Swiss-Prot record:
This is ATP synthase F(0) complex subunit a. It comes from Phoca vitulina (Harbor seal). The chain crosses the membrane at residues 12-32, 68-88, 97-117, 138-158, 164-184, 189-209. SUPFAM superfamilies: F1F0 ATP synthase subunit A. It comes from the Eukaryota.
């Protein structure tokens, strides 16, 4: 049966109900809790990655911003693991859904903005009007700054969706071309297969980079409001 090019991005359903939440939560069952007192290599690597990430993300924050440490670490681990699991064959990637990415971006962005208005009301309002603005340009700049503020969560979600979707489409297209060329030209099929392997390696890097970029931008929004 021929699949649509965008079939892998359709939300899977069971008895008419979306099972995205089940897909997202199921990988946690695959990692049993360790019973040993000394951590194994996998746990040591996880701790090292968490420490490195927290050092990069939280070094710019004050004490109020550092209260978001658990949220930021959980966010980067969730997005990174979801992106990596989506690279498995015949799997579903939740981060290709704009609705899910907006569901992550809007509450996090709103939380940073509300935190800013609660603790730094004057400084938050000052962002809408740069210092030294000529009087005739004040209404226009306030409108522009307001629009740019509300575009931030949309930019977060669209960036993640577009990058993950584009990579999956390229893998799908090059993989289909490789299968089609196997009966026509073995040498050409080998070249496209090599490109497919390199692109897959690149997608593993993109999956981690996009998780880092998403979390870093949330961290920067938090830094501007604390």
């Amino acid at each position: 049966m021929n699949e649509n090019l965008f079939a892998s991005f359709a939300t899977p359903t069971m008895m008419g109900l979306p099972i995205v939440i089940l897909i997202v939560l199921f990988p946690s069952i695959l990692f049993p809790s360790p019973d040993r007192l000394i951590n194994n290599r996998l746990a040591s690597i996880q701790q090292w990655l968490i420490q490195l990430t927290s050092k990069q993300m939280l070094s710019i924050h004050n004490r109020k911003g550092q209260t978001w440490a658990l949220m930021l670490i959980s966010l980067i681990l969730f997005i990174g693991s979801t992106n990596l699991l989506g690279l498995l064959p015949h799997s579903f990637t939740p981060t290709t859904q704009l609705s899910m990415n907006l569901g992550m971006a809007i509450p996090l962005w709103a939380g940073t903005v509300i935190t800013g208005f609660r603790h730094k009301t004057k400084a938050s309002l000052a962002h809408f009007l740069p210092q030294g603005t000529p009087l005739p340009l004040i209404p226009m700049l306030v409108i522009i700054e307001t629009i740019s503020l509300f575009i931030q969560p949309m930019a977060l979600a669209v960036r993640l969706t577009a990058n993950i979707t584009a990579g999956h489409l390229l893998i799908h297209l090059i993989g289909g071309a490789t299968l089609a060329l196997m009966d026509i030209s073995t040498a050409t099929a080998f070249i496209t297969f090599t490109i497919l392997i390199l692109l897959t390696i690149l997608e593993f890097a993109v999956a981690l980079i996009q998780a880092y970029v998403f979390t870093l931008l949330v961290s920067l929004y938090l830094h501007d409001n604390t």
